[in-house]
């Protein structure tokens, strides 16, 4: 054993040396245990010549007591010279002498999930005196809490109410990890089953594992478990029960397999306590007569299986050199919690430079799939492959394969013998009540003082979701570096195992109810990569494994993929690392933009890639059973308000609402007065109005002669009020990307990264307070945080002073301005695209398409090619119900003969202040650039608008816009000319540039 391994032995030596045998714990059983093992400690003698110590054992041989030193079995966990540590049960539990063993077997092809036929029945079993009880376990509630344990538990036999001469099935579950409380025969071949809740609780009924004998082959039996508590289950999504036949195992070497027909998970009648329960029913035909069969929720993995596995490692001369097995602590029932230290032994100081990796499993005893993943990990890391050797040379692995052996032994689903969920008590100071998690946390704390811990992972099972995924932790600081780095390892795992691991199902939020879980506690202790790996009880929905169940080999393979991903994560060649980092940046950019524009009231700092779902089938379930012997919780009395206080509160609320209504009307009136003298600088022209668009704002950008032509009558002074009428009650930001390129070049915009090197992305800011012809240009590098850009896009107006009236706003008016968003400032009119048009002198077909919600909004633009060099990004303030960006779609074509046909899409009707589902409409804008002969003249020609708006001034001077027409049929966009020849003649042979902008929700 290396020097480093000696110093890092975090075993619970304070209690491991005084509990070697059963007689040390309970003196009432000393005589029975002495008769069996014929051992006695020197401390048991009253002779003063014998030293009072527990380290000397007296063995009775040939009529005399022979002293010898106690073997350090507790120190090393398992010993090659002696048997395994005996399994201890609560004293009242009945245990059969028969040892249950199963063979390892993997089906030749993946087992498909069950597809409902629609003919499944829902049996309901009212209480009937004619029903026969065929199995009844001993009452588990003789004591309100755990008292003490002993080897073998209570060996009093339980008589069956039937014999072998009857055709009634015989049930048994009094073995390790077995769970079955009661069985009632309701028909000749139909049985109603009740599973036992976790000991010392009245809930957590999910795990079942029982034996069936005395069956007849070819008979259709129905089994119905009637006391599940979860409304949602994977059985509703095609999961099948597991079945094991001893005759099939001996004859054909077939192990656990998925079986069952007529599978149905449904809500049944309420129980006696008024709670609603859920039933699982299935039918099955046994393959053999008089066979011994088993049914289970998932592949069983018992405490004895773990001890046998660890004993094999300890007896292996090769693996035992780099895998040291110790006892971390003892549980409430005095069962051992093992810890493994896996690393290549080194006697020099280089071993301290190694980083540590921590893995734990089976904190929830019913999640047996976590033990199979742990087994796969240990098989690989202890193997002789070059990658395994590299991992052992690089890291120090601390592994706790079973955190809750007590719960595993008695067949609990979630809790320990304390009646509590251990994965909610990592912050608890009750070492005696939750020893395994207390010592695990202490071990990690001491380990972090000596070396860096790069990863912690707690293995779990999930009862409501398919696939395998992870839960991580996000910081409140929202640092982009840490924010993305915490997602790199799960992303690598999904790439190494694409048919089992789902990155999209991974969640990274830290909720208050999860603060006691292992991953959150370890993350707060300083472990950046702190995860919970969730493995489904069912199967996969990905790749080649889609629609099939996971086998034990599938679960074990996740241990290999975990090691493979760990090598990729720590590879000195950072190619894969940065590739995943770049992919995560793209995911964040797209998903965050979608969430920003879905609800612009949400601050950017609060927008994340995910919202962790409630995982009551995983590490996030609540266990709030109170134990008086653990902690006495004093109930807090709720102090009710007096009638006078309640009336005062109601009156204050009414006054606040009245003041709010008054302030709103007052602000709206002042807003109308302050904008009454706003002058429209756009010129009037006889047949169509031309908007001097961006002329004053961008004189130095080659857009001095950029005009927007809209069909219809002359621009009336009421246009400003009409445009204002289209604004909603929220402030949003519209992003208009104007691409200035050299003519004659074709730039592929589809899939182009706006943050890449092929574009120069800038932001333009205008000085507040006076009109100026210069603009301040700020160039942002692509690696800057995306959140900074998003915050700058949706920031509110920084000036609360009216530009025309010179009136200063009060604090209350500013607050109301922010809350209600009803003020339209002059800056909006400087950048606002005119969207209200007249239908005068238009064809009937054009009018129909004008008011068609599916018609595209087209813009024709002329630019000066002399200044077309850079890409500029302009941000204009817009007040619409939803905030959506313009997304580039298609290619930029410098050929006037190539017309891009518009795709049917939703219109700009979402700009109207409508409520309900109409807020999520889509729209798109086509910008068509025509090059003219004159170098300094350019025009924006706009086709018919895709919708019509009618603004009305209502009572209290509130503005409301109504959509005039909403047709659902699909139309193509109006062309600006009747045919291509006319367009070519109109442009005098000059090339045309098409820009297509699409706004999506």
UniProtKB/Swiss-Prot annotation:
UniProt record, GO biological process: protein side chain deglutamylation; proteolysis
Catalytic activity: (L-glutamyl)(n+1)-gamma-L-glutamyl-L-glutamyl-[protein] + H2O = (L-glutamyl)(n)-gamma-L-glutamyl-L-glutamyl-[protein] + L-glutamate
Main localisation: cytoplasm
Composition-biased stretches (Polar residues): 648-657, 962-971
Location of the Peptidase M14 domain: 299-570
Subcellular location: Cytoplasm, Cytosol
A cellular-component GO term for this protein: centriole
Catalytic activity, EC: 3.4.17.-
Residues binding Zn(2+), per UniProt: 364, 367, 460
Molecular functions (GO terms): metallocarboxypeptidase activity; tubulin binding; zinc ion binding
Keyword rRNA processing: no
UniProt-annotated catalytic positions: 534 (proton donor/acceptor)
InterPro entries named in the record: Cytosolic_carboxypeptidase (IPR050821), Pepdidase_M14_N (IPR040626), Peptidase_M14 (IPR000834)
Enzyme's top EC category: hydrolase
Cofactor requirement: Zn(2+)
Family to which this protein belongs: Belongs to the peptidase M14 family.
Protein name per UniProt: Cytosolic carboxypeptidase 3
Gene: AGBL3
């Amino acid at each position: 054993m290396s020097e480093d391994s000696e110093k890092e032995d975090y075993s619970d030596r304070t209690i491991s040396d005084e509990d070697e045998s059963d007689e040390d714990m309970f003196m009432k059983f000393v005589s029975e245990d002495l008769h069996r093992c014929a051992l006695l400690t020197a401390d048991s003698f009253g002779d003063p010549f014998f030293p009072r110590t527990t380290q000397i054992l007296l063995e009775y041989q040939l009529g005399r007591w022979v002293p010898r030193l106690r073997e350090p079995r507790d120190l090393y966990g398992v010993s090659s010279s002696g048997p395994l540590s005996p399994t201890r049960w609560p004293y009242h539990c009945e245990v059969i002498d028969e040892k249950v063993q199963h063979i390892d077997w993997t089906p030749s092809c993946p087992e498909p999930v069950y597809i409902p036929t629609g003919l499944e029945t829902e049996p309901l079993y009212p209480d009937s005196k004619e029903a026969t009880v065929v199995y009844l376990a001993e009452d588990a509630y003789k004591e309100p809490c755990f008292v003490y344990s002993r080897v073998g538990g209570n060996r009093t036999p339980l008589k069956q109410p039937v014999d072998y001469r009857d055709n009634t099935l015989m049930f048994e579950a009094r073995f390790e990890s077995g769970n079955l409380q009661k069985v009632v025969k309701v028909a000749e071949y139909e049985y109603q089953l009740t599973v036992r809740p976790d000991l010392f609780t009245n809930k957590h009924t999910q795990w079942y594992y029982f034996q069936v004998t005395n069956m007849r082959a070819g008979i259709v039996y129905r089994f119905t478990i009637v006391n599940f508590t979860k409304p949602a289950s994977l059985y509703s999504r095609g999961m099948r029960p597991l079945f094991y036949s001893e005759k099939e195992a001996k004859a054909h070497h077939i192990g656990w397999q998925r079986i069952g027909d007529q599978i149905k998970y449904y809500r049944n009648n309420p129980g006696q306590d008024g709670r609603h329960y859920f039933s699982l029913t299935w039918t099955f035909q046994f393959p053999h007569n008089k066979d011994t069969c088993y049914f289970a929720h998932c592949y069983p993995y018992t405490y004895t299986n773990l001890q046998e596995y660890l004993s094999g490692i300890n007896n292996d001369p090769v693996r035992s050199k780099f895998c040291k097995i110790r006892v971390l602590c003892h549980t409430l029932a005095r069962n051992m919690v093992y810890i493994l230290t896996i690393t290549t032994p080194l006697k020099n100081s280089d071993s301290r430079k190694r980083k540590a990796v921590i893995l734990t499993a089976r904190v929830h005893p019913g999640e047996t799939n976590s033990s199979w993943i742990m087994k796969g990990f240990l098989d690989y890391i202890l193997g002789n492959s070059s990658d395994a050797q590299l991992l052992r040379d690089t890291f120090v692995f601390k592994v706790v394969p079973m955190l809750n052996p007590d719960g595993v032994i008695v067949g609990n689903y979630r809790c320990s013998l304390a009646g509590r969920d251990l994965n909610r008590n990592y912050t608890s100071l009750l070492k005696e009540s939750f020893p395994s998690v207390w010592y695990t946390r202490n071990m990690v704390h001491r380990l972090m003082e000596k070396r860096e811990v790069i990863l912690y992972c707690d293995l779990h099972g999930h009862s409501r979701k398919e696939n395998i995924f992870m839960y991580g932790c996000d910081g409140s600081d929202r640092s982009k570096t840490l924010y993305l780095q915490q997602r790199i390892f799960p992303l690598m795992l999904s790439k190494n195992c694409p048919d089992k691991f789902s990155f999209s199902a991974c969640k990274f939020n830290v909720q208050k109810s999860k603060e006691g879980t292992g991953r959150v506690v370890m993350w707060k202790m300083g472990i950046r990569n702190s995860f919970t790996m969730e493995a489904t009880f069912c199967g996969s929905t990905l790749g080649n494994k889609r629609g099939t169940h996971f086998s034990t080999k599938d679960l074990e393979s996740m241990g290999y993929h975990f090691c493979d991903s760990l090598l990729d994560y720590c590879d000195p060649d950072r190619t894969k690392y940065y590739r995943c980092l770049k992919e995560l940046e793209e995911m964040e950019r797209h998903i965050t933009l979608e969430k920003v524009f879905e609800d612009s009231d949400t601050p950017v700092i609060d927008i994340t890639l995910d919202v962790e779902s409630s995982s009551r089938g995983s590490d996030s379930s609540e266990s709030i059973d109170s134990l008086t012997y653990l902690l006495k919780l004093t109930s807090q009395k709720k102090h009710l308000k007096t009638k006078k206080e309640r009336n005062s509160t109601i009156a204050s609320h009414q006054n606040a609402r009245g003041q709010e209504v008054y302030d709103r009307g007052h602000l709206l009136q002042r807003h109308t007065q302050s904008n009454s003298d706003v002058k429209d600088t756009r010129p009037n022209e006889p047949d169509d109005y031309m908007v001097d668009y961006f002329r004053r704002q961008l004189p130095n950008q080659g857009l001095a002669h950029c005009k927007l032509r809209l069909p219809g009558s002359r621009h009336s002074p009421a246009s400003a009020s009409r445009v204002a009428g289209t604004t909603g009650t929220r402030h949003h930001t519209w992003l208009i990307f104007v691409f200035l390129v050299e003519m004659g070049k074709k730039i592929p915009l589809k899939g182009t990264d706006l943050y890449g090197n092929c574009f120069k992305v800038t932001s333009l800011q205008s000085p507040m307070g006076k009109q100026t012809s210069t603009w301040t240009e700020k160039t942002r590098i692509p690696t800057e945080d995306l959140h900074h850009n998003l915050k700058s896009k949706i920031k509110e107006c920084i000036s609360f002073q009216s530009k025309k009236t010179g009136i200063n706003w009060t604090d209350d008016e500013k607050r109301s301005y922010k809350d209600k968003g009803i003020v339209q400032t002059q800056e909006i009119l400087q950048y606002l695209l005119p969207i209200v048009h007249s239908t005068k002198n238009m064809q009937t077909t054009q009018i129909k398409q004008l008011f068609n919600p599916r018609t595209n909004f087209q813009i024709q633009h002329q630019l000066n090619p002399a200044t077309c060099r850079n890409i500029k990004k302009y941000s204009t303030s817009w007040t619409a119900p939803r905030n959506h960006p313009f997304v580039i779609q298609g290619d930029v074509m410098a050929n006037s003969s190539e017309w891009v046909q518009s795709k049917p899409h939703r219109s700009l009707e979402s700009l109207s202040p409508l409520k309900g589902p109409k807020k999520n409409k889509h729209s798109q804008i086509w910008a068509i650039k025509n090059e003219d002969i004159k170098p300094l003249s350019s025009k924006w020609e706009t086709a018919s608008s895709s919708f019509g708006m009618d603004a009305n001034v209502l009572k209290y001077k509130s503005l409301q816009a109504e959509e005039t027409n909403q047709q659902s049929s699909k139309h193509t966009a109006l062309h600006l000319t009747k045919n291509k020849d006319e367009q070519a003649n109109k442009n005098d042979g000059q090339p045309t540039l098409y820009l297509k902008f699409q706004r999506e929700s």
